[in-house]
From Swiss-Prot:
Function description: Mast cell degranulating peptide.
Tissue specificity field: Expressed by the venom gland.
Entry annotated with the keyword Secreted: yes
Superkingdom field: Eukaryota
Name the UniProt record assigns to this protein: Mast cell degranulating peptide
Subcellular location: Secreted
Organism taxonomic ancestry: Eukaryota, Metazoa, Ecdysozoa, Arthropoda, Hexapoda
Keywords for the protein's UniProt record, in alphabetical order: Disulfide bond, Mast cell degranulation, Secreted
Length: 28
C-alpha cells in the first residue's frame, strides 16, 4: 500500500506512482 496519508510519499518514481494511485483510489 502507499504511504501518502502522512503527506510524505515514498522517494523515487515509486512514490510518484504511489501518490498517483492514492489520488485515484483515495482510500481514507
Amino acid at each position: 500500500m502507499c504511504i501518502c496519508k502522512n503527506g510524505k510519499p515514498l522517494p523515487g518514481f515509486i512514490g510518484k506512482i504511489c501518490r498517483k494511485i492514492c489520488m485515484m483510489q483515495q482510500t481514507h
